[in-house]
UniProtKB/Swiss-Prot annotation:
Belongs to the prokaryotic/mitochondrial release factor family. PANTHER family: LD18447P. Pfam families: PCRF, RF-1. The gene is prfA. The keyword Protein biosynthesis applies. The lineage of its organism: Bacteria, Pseudomonadati, Pseudomonadota, Gammaproteobacteria, Lysobacterales. The modification N5-methylglutamine is found at Q235. The keyword Protein biosynthesis applies. One of its GO terms (cellular component) is cytoplasm. PROSITE patterns: RF_PROK_I. InterPro entries: PCRF, Pep_chain_release_fac_I, Pep_chain_release_fac_I_sf, Prokaryotic/Mito_RF, RF-1. This is Peptide chain release factor 1.
Length: 361
């Protein structure tokens, strides 16, 4: 670990002690918002403190074993203990480095998943459906819940567009690097000549806005339309205009919801999505500017960026943001087995962040 990273760890340890002192202050205890904020920060620093304490114990074990090495009768045992302590210190060094990576406060939260067919006609809609099913099955494996908020089915299967809310701890942390353009190469079911077609779909991963996050939305900037729902709810929804479409005129963002029986419930859901979209747009601008400055690929949040190609003839998936990231496991991945792919992206992002931290004072 570099001296710069070690200094940052020491600063975090000092901050933990400071937080423990602050949280015993009656003025802080009496202020619910401040107490909650500081308590959350302290809980995030606990893993760092625990790892540092374990590192100190491993260093003490190493020193004891090295002292015993001079004793001929204890040398063999000492060598074993030295090797074990050194291996543990290497593990802790990597663990502490990963704990230094700034934690995104949205990582534990829910998200909105949007999949839209791009170029390629019917095949693009079918591919969009395949992508949505891939994410839905991955979510099921994680124990998350997927709630479709709106959809527009394709004429021959799949979706022209589908929007869903994914609910589960850590959902955003695992799927946040999926935003972008996904391209597929395969022979469509409707292709009689056996020719390979290329089509595309776009994916957007938008973190659900926290209740404490503030964004001012002027009611005068909203255009609200009602229409008859074609979604869940049976015959009732087709007899009343319960579905809601909200347009934020200044930004052009449009959201709709038709899954609930009541217009009021659909409006509440639509407003949550609108708030999330507007907050995400602000963050995306900042992330894109930072990524351009730092020349990052993973985590840039650019939805126009082609991030991945699914080549069915070769059974291959290539992620274009990470050099050499090609997996020959397409059948399992498209069925929701995303752990290996997501793990590589998270590792790359962590490496980028550690490089940035090492370069900063």
């Amino acid at each position: 670990m570099t001296p710069t990273l070690r200094r940052k760890l020491e600063a975090l340890a000092e901050r933990r002690e400071e937080l423990q002192h602050l949280l015993s202050d009656p003025d802080v205890v009496g202020n619910n918002d401040t107490f909650r904020t500081l308590s959350r920060e302290l809980s995030q620093l606990e893993p760092v403190a625990m790892a540092l304490e374990e590192e100190a114990r491993a260093k003490a074990d190493l020193a004891t074993a090295e002292a015993l090495r001079n004793d001929p009768e204890m040398r063999e045992l000492a060598e074993e203990e030295i090797a074990a302590a050194q291996a543990r210190l290497e593990q802790l060094d990597a663990q502490l480095a990963s704990l230094l990576v700034p934690r995104d406060p949205r990582d534990d939260g829910n998200l909105f998943l949007e999949v839209r067919a791009g170029t390629g006609g019917d095949e693009a809609a079918i591919f969009a459906g395949d992508l949505f099913r891939m994410y839905a099955r991955y979510a099921e494996r994680q124990g998350w819940k997927v709630e479709i908020e709106s959809d527009s089915p394709g004429e021959h299967g799949g979706y022209k567009e589908v929007v869903a809310r994914v609910v589960g701890r850590g959902a955003y942390s695992r799927l946040k690097f999926e935003s972008g353009t996904h391209r597929v190469q395969r022979v469509p079911a409707t292709e009689s000549q056996g020719r390979i077609h290329t089509s595309a779909a776009t994916v957007a991963i938008i973190p659900e806005a926290d209740d404490v996050e503030e964004i001012t939305i002027n009611p005068a900037d909203l255009k609200v339309d009602t229409f008859r729902s074609s979604g869940a709810g049976g015959q009732h929804v087709n007899k009343t205009e319960s579905a809601i479409r909200i347009t934020h005129v200044p930004s052009g963002v449009v959201v709709e919801c038709q899954t609930e029986r009541s217009q009021h419930a659909n409006r509440d859901k639509a407003m949550k999505r609108l708030k999330a979209q507007l907050l995400d747009a602000e963050r995306s601008k900042a992330a894109a500017a930072e990524a351009q400055t730092r020349k990052l690929q993973v985590g840039s949040g650019d939805r126009s960026q082609r991030i991945r190609t699914y080549s069915f003839p070769q059974g291959r998936i290539t992620d274009h943001r990470v050099e050499g990231l090609t997996l020959y496991d397409l059948p399992n991945i498209i069925e929701g087995d995303l752990d290996a792919l997501i793990g590589r992206l998270l590792h790359e992002h962590q490496a980028d962040e550690l490089a940035r931290l090492s370069d900063s004072p």
